[in-house]
Amino acid sequence: KPGFYSIQGNHEQMLCAALRDGDALAEYCWVRNGGNWFYELPKAEQQQIRDHWLPKLEQLPLVIDLYTVDNVHVGICHADPVFNDWQELLTALKEYKAKKRDDLIEKLVWSRERISLANKTDLLSEAYRIKGIDWCVMGHTPIRPTPYRKGNCLWLDSGAVFPGGYLSVLEAGKDLHCHQASA
């Protein structure tokens, strides 16, 4: 739907690797991270998911660069923008090749470095500012209280998959508003 955005994260990548490649290690990794539901489905439904959803999931963007109607520049990535400059990330995603690009993508969807440092230090919030953007919105690491903010970084993963967790949705306008509901 217009106004709703989805990006590719580590779970989407695990699903795609398991279903596309049929690699036993990829399947094992996906099952260990919640993918067991797929193998409990009838074979016909599994094939339907492969045929219909796999191409769509593989096309999800790794980052979203958007402007709200109030001209607020919001960058969205799954885990960590890796760089301290949003434009540098966008350029690297376009220009990096092969192994260097794969390493960047792995950090983009798996890294917990930025949130770990934010939790361990009392550095001023400005030390966590991503240049070239008003807000950088991330998830991947369940954290409470949610949303958690440091500089212009905002983490939204409120652990919806865990008991007591809830789903967070961000409404981006002139100000950012987080709405939450029990999962």
Show where each model-derived region lies:
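Conserved protein kinase catalytic core
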Residues: L15-C16, N84, T146, P163
